[in-house]
Amino acid sequence: MPATGIFADSITKIKNTIKALGLVAVTDPRNARPLTCLIEMPTYTQFTNQVADISVVVHILATPPGNQESGDYLMTTLDTLMDSELAITGGSPTLVVIGAQELPAYDVTIRIGAQR
């Protein structure tokens, strides 16, 4: 059964925005691969039972090894996301382990205010 509610709606908004930018967005780690954006589960701060401040980390994944070519891809993709309607509050370069492989990545935090 697919998820419903404000958390699922927030993930869907992020995923659709990333796709509209011509990027590949995935929510299932089994489908994560280089040149995709892996959307993590949300964290949140609740104000009332009707309002929440939702944060979602998106991993921009590049091809190994972590050389200049992958760095260029990460910075270009990050710039594309920053130029969108997404409310990006921060980010940092990292390595993401998918299966047994380390992928160069950039972790981007996106915030969404959600209301029922």
Provide a role label for each language-model segment.
Residues 31-41:
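Short, well-ordered secondary-structure micro-motifs within conserved domains or adaptor modules
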